[in-house]
C-alpha cells in the first residue's frame, strides 16, 4: 500500500520503480552466468543503473508521449503489484529476489548514511510537536488507541516478527558459517533501528501542516484542496493551498494531498534535507530518488514475504499430499504462491479502495501480527536453546 500510494498518478515515481525490476534481473544473470563471482562489478553496474533510472524518470515525466504509459491509478498499480508478487514468488531466488535484496541494501545504507551526514551538517529544527492529539485517542487524522499503533512505529526499528520469518527461512541458506549470524542478525537490527531514527527525523523536520496535508486520507479531510486545508487548519496546524501546490511543483508531482502511507511524506522530508545541504535546485531529483530508495527495499519485503509464506504453506500442504510439500514441484509452487498472494492482495485491494487509506484496517492488523510473530519467534528460540542444552543462553530470548 505504501508503494502504491507513492506511485499513483506519478509517472516519474512509477517509471523509476518499474525500472528496478529489469535492473535486478540483469544483475542476477550477470552474477550467475556472465561474470560469476564478480560481485563488485555487478554492484557497480546495478547502483549506476538505479541512479540512471531516477534521472530517466524525469525525462519520462516531461515527455507528453511517454508519461501516459506510467500514469496510473492506485487500483491499477495494486493489481500490477499483485501480479508482480506472484511472479516474484515463482521465479528462482537468484533471478530477482537475491539481486534486488542485495542492491536495496547498498541503496538503503548509502542513502541513510548520506542522510545522517546531511542532518549532522544542517542540524535541522524539529517542527513536529512531541505529542499530538492522537495520544488521547482523539486524532488528528483518526481516533484510536495508542496500542497497537505504537507497535507499527517500532516494528522494524526495534523488534520485528517479519524479520524472524526471513531469518529462519531465507537467510540460513545464504550464510557459510554460524559465526556470521551475530553480525548479520544483530547488526542488521541495529541498522534497522538507525534507519528508523533517520526516517523519524526526516518526517519531523517538515512543517506539521504540510505533513498532515500529505498523510491525511481523503475520507477524513476531503478531496478538494480548500476543504483539506480548512480541515488541517482546524486541527491547529498552519498550511496553505499555495504552499502545497508549490511543494508539489518543486518535487515534480501533480499533487501531494492525501498521499498516505508514509512514503511520500518521508521522501519530501529526505528531499528537503538533501536539497538544503547539497542544492535546492535538485529537490525533485532528491524526492524521486527517495521514492525509489523506499520502494526498492519495500518490494524486497514483498518478494521475501511472499516466498516465505509460500514455503510455510507448502510445508503444511505436504501433510495432505507429499508432492504438495516439495518446494521444487512447479504445480505446488504455483498453487501455494497463488494462495499467499491472494491473501495479501485482498488486503491491498481493500486498502486502496478504502477512503481512509486502509489506516483502520491494515495498520492495526500489521502492528498486532508483527509483534505476535516476534513473540512466537522468541518462544521458539528459547525452546530450541533449552532443548539443545544451552539453557544459560535462554535469558537472551
What is each model feature region?
Residues 71-91, 118-124, 136-176, 184, ...:
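Hydrophobic, membrane-embedded alpha-helices of multi-pass small-molecule transporters
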Residues 88, 93-100, 153-180, 184-189, ...:
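Helix-loop junctions at the membrane interface of multi-pass solute transporters
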Residues 2-10, 28-35, 53-67, 88-98, ...:
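Transmembrane helix-loop junctions in multi-pass membrane proteins
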Amino acid at each position: 500500500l505504501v508503494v502504491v500510494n507513492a506511485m499513483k498518478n506519478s509517472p516519474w515515481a512509477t517509471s523509476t520503480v518499474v525500472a528496478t525490476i529489469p535492473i535486478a534481473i540483469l544483475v542476477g544473470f550477470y552474477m550467475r552466468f556472465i561474470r560469476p563471482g564478480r560481485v563488485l562489478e555487478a554492484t557497480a553496474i546495478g547502483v549506476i543503473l538505479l541512479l540512471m533510472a531516477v534521472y530517466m524518470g524525469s525525462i519520462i515525466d516531461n515527455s507528453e508521449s511517454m508519461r501516459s504509459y506510467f500514469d496510473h491509478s492506485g487500483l491499477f498499480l495494486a493489481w500490477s503489484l499483485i501480479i508482480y508478487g506472484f511472479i516474484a514468488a515463482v521465479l528462482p531466488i537468484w533471478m530477482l529476489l537475491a539481486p534486488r535484496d542485495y542492491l536495496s541494501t547498498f541503496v538503503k545504507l548509502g542513502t541513510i548514511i548520506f542522510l545522517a551526514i546531511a542532518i549532522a551538517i544542517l542540524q535541522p529544527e524539529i517542527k513536529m510537536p512531541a505529542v499530538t492529539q492522537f495520544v488521547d485517542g482523539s486524532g488528528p487524522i483518526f481516533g484510536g488507541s495508542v496500542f497497537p499503533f505504537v507497535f507499527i512505529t517500532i516494528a522494524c526499528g526495534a523488534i520485528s516478527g517479519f524479520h524472524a520469518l526471513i531469518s529462519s527461512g531465507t537467510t540460513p541458506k545464504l550464510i557459510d558459517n554460524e559465526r556470521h549470524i551475530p553480525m548479520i542478525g544483530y547488526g542488521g537490527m541495529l541498522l534497522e533501528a538507525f534507519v528508523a531514527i533517520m526516517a523519524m527525523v526526516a518526517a519531523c523536520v517538515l512543517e506539521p501542516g504540510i505533513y498532515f496535508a500529505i498523510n491525511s486520507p481523503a475520507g477524513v479531510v476531503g478531496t478538494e484542496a480548500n476543504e483539506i486545508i480548512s480541515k488541517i487548519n482546524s486541527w491547529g496546524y498552519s498550511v496553505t493551498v499555495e504552499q502545497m501546490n508549490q511543494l508539489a511543483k518543486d518535487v515534480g508531482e501533480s499533487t501531494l494531498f492525501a498521499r498516505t502511507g508514509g512514503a511520500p511524506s518521508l521522501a519530501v522530508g529526505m528531499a528537503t534535507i538533501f536539497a538544503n545541504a547539497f542544492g535546492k535546485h535538485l529537490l525533485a531529483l532528491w524526492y524521486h530518488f527517495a521514492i525509489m530508495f523506499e520502494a526498492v527495499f519495500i518490494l524486497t519485503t514483498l518478494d521475501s514475504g511472499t516466498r516465505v509464506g509460500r514455503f510455510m504453506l507448502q510445508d503444511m500442504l505436504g501433510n495432505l499430499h507429499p508432492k504438495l510439500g516439495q518446494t521444487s514441484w512447479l504445480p505446488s509452487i504455483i498453487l501455494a504462491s497463488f494462495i499467499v498472494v491472494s491473501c495479501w492482495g485482498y488486503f491491498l485491494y481493500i486498502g486502496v479502495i478504502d477512503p481512509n487509506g486502509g489506516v483502520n484496517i491494515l495498520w492495526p492488523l500489521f502492528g498486532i501480527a508483527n509483534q505476535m510473530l516476534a513473540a512466537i519467534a522468541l518462544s521458539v528460540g528459547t525452546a530450541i536453546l533449552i532443548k539443545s542444552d544451552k539453557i544459560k543462553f535462554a535469558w537472551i530470548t
